[in-house]
Amino acid sequence: MRALRFLIENRNTVFFTLLVALVLSLYLLVYLFSHTPRPPYPEELKYIAIDEKGHEVSRALPNLNEHQDDEEIFLSVVIPSYNETGRILLMLTDAISFLKEKYGSRWEIVIVDDGSTDNTTQYCLKICKEQFKLNYEQFRIIKFSQNRGKGGAVRQGFLHIRGKYGLFADADGASKFSDVEKLIDAISKIETSSTDLKTTKPAVAIGSRAHMVNTEAVIKRSMIRNCLMYGFHTLVFIFGIRSIKDTQCGFKLFNRAAILKIFPYLHTEGWIFDVEILILAIRKRIQIEEIPISWHEVDGSKMALAIDSIKMAKDLVIIRMAYLLGIYRDNKKC
C-alpha cells in the first residue's frame, strides 16, 4: 500500500522518470542498429582501366570536390555491380551506344564492383578493350575487396565522378537508358528556374515505374513479391516520404550541386539507401522530380526477397528514427 500511495503522490515524477528511461532506451537501441559507412580500403581509392596502349592500369580516383568546374565530362554513369557477368553486357551496349551518339566523348562510366566472386571486373575490362574500344577517360572500374552493399557501391562511385551530372543506373539494364534525357530535361528546368545566377540550384530527377502498376510487367510478378512491394511502399508512406511514388527505381540523376549535398552524408550501404537519399534531399529542400520511364523485369536479381525485404523494413525504421533522434545529422559528413 505504501508503494501504491507513493506512486500516486509522486505520479508526475514517476511518469517523467519512465518517459526519460523510455527515450534513452529508444535512443540506445537505434544507435546500436544505426549505420556508419565503412572507410574505403587503400585499393578502393583507385580505379582500374585500360590505357591508350591497351594495358591494364590502376590510378588514383579523382575527388568529387576537385572537379566542380570540369565541363569536359557532361554525364557520369555509376553502375553498382555484384556478380553481373551474365547481365551487364546488354546494359553497357545500350548505354554506350546512346552516350556516344548523344554526347560524343563527354561522358564516363564508373562501374563499382561490390566484391564480386565471378570476375566481374576482368569481364568488364575485357569487353571494354575488345568490344567497346574504350580507355580510362571513359571507362573506369572501382573494385571492392569485400562486399559493402549496393548503397556503399553507389556512394563510393558518386564521390569520385567528374561529370556535371551523375546518373545511378542498375547493371541489369531494366530501365531504357535513353530515358536519361527525360531526367536531364527535368533537372535543367529546375536549374533555369533559379533566380541565383552565381550558383547552380541542387536538383534530383528519379525514374519512376509507378505508372506501370497495372501493366503486364508488374502483374506477372509473383503474389508474394507484389505483396511485399505494396507493404514496403505503405511503410515508406507512413514514415514520411509521401510525394514520391517509386523510391526504389534504379535510375536516378543528380546535378553536381545535389551530389555534394547528399552523398558525403549518406549512412546506409544496404538496399534501403535510395530512401535515405530522398530523405536527405527532402530535409535539405532539394527539389525532386519523379519522371515516368520505360522499364521491364530482368531475371537474376541479387535480392533475397523475404530476408532482404524484412531487413529493408527494419533499416527504414532505423533511418527515420536516427534522423529524428539526432543520431544521423544532415550537416555532418560520414
UniProtKB/Swiss-Prot annotation:
Cellular localization per UniProt: Endoplasmic reticulum membrane
Topology versus the membrane: Single-pass membrane protein
Assigned keywords, A-Z: Endoplasmic reticulum, Glycosyltransferase, Membrane, Signal-anchor, Transferase, Transmembrane, Transmembrane helix
Spans within the Lumenal topological domain: 1-12
Phenotype upon gene inactivation: Leads to a loss of UDP-glucose:dolichyl-phosphate glucosyltransferase activity and a concomitant underglycosylation of carboxypeptidase Y.
E.C. no: 2.4.1.117
Listed transmembrane segments: 13-33
GO biological process, one term: protein N-linked glycosylation
Gene3D superfamilies xref list: Spore Coat Polysaccharide Biosynthesis Protein SpsA, Chain A
UniProt GO molecular function: dolichyl-phosphate beta-glucosyltransferase activity
Pfam families assigned: Glycos_transf_2
Reactions the enzyme catalyzes: a di-trans,poly-cis-dolichyl phosphate + UDP-alpha-D-glucose = a di-trans,poly-cis-dolichyl beta-D-glucosyl phosphate + UDP
Methyltransferase is among the record's keywords: no
Segments on the Cytoplasmic side according to the record's topology features: 34-334
Pathway field: Protein modification; protein glycosylation
Cellular component per GO, a single term: endoplasmic reticulum membrane
Family stated for the protein in its record: Belongs to the glycosyltransferase 2 family.
Other noteworthy facts: Present with 5800 molecules/cell in log phase SD medium.
Protein task: Endoplasmic reticulum membrane-bound UDP-glucose:dolichyl-phosphate glucosyltransferase involved in protein N-linked glycosylation.
Name under which the protein is recorded: Dolichyl-phosphate beta-glucosyltransferase
